[in-house]
A protein has these predicted regions:
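PAPS-dependent sulfotransferase catalytic domain
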Residues: 1-21, 27-148
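PAPS-dependent sulfotransferase catalytic core
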Residues: 2-6, 98-99, 111, 145-200
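A residue-level signal for conserved active-site and pocket-lining positions in enzyme catalytic cores
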Residues: 24, 136, 179, 183
Length: 200
């Protein structure tokens, strides 16, 4: 992932068409928690020790939790330390804003992210991956149609967390509340792209 501040610092906007994908926030945090937890599997040991100490510590903590319990996530949110905010707190807003790693995402960061979202020329939605790729493909003027797109970074493992469950959604709410607003705006831009390219 490349954050928007990193993009602005290192790339000339005039030389690039910017595309970004967004994911339903509950699905995103569920996947991310599973990914970090998976680092504690014995076969992942070498990969785990390549990560910073903060990631290793939280992976170990997650390995001891009951992912299926809403009480787990209530406590997880309450006990999250500033050094861990950058791993789990409203990550999609975080990617588009200037939020510091040890800083909670707030309303100012959300407004900054929404403003930057408007500068992104092509918005993809993970839940509509193939259609998103087709729209991006069409917008870029490529000759050949997109026949098959492969998502190579999809988790195939689960430890029992289900954030389609309302109790779990409420428990994890503080970690996705700003992302939910951003995601709704991303969906709107995606729908606008649908309309635009259906006319072209």
């Amino acid at each position: 992932h490349i954050t928007y501040p990193t993009y602005e610092k290192n790339f000339s906007p005039s030389n690039f068409v910017v595309a970004a994908f967004f994911r339903e926030p509950h699905k995103h945090i569920e996947s991310h928690l599973n990914w970090v937890r998976h680092l504690m599997e014995p076969k992942k040991h070498d990969f785990l020790i390549e990560h910073p100490a903060v990631v290793q510590t939280i992976a170990q903590k997650l390995s001891l939790l009951d992912f299926a319990s809403s009480k787990t996530w209530q406590q997880f949110v309450k006990q999250l330390k500033p050094v861990q905010f950058g791993l789990f707190d409203n990550l999609q807003v975080r990617y588009l804003s200037d939020a510091k790693p040890a800083e909670r995402v707030n309303e100012t960061h959300l407004q900054q992210a929404l403003a930057r979202l408007k500068k992104i020329q092509l918005v993809g939605i993970a839940e509509h991956f193939d259609e998103s790729m087709s729209l991006i493909h069409q917008a870029m003027g490529f000759d050949m149609p997109v026949e098959k797109n492969v998502r190579s970074n999809v988790n195939s493992f689960s430890y029992g967390a289900d954030f389609s469950n309302l109790d779990n959604q409420q428990a994890i709410g503080p970690l996705v509340k700003f992302d939910q607003v951003l995601y709704q705006q991303a969906l709107l831009q995606f729908e606008q792209q649908r309309v635009k390219f259906s006319k072209d």
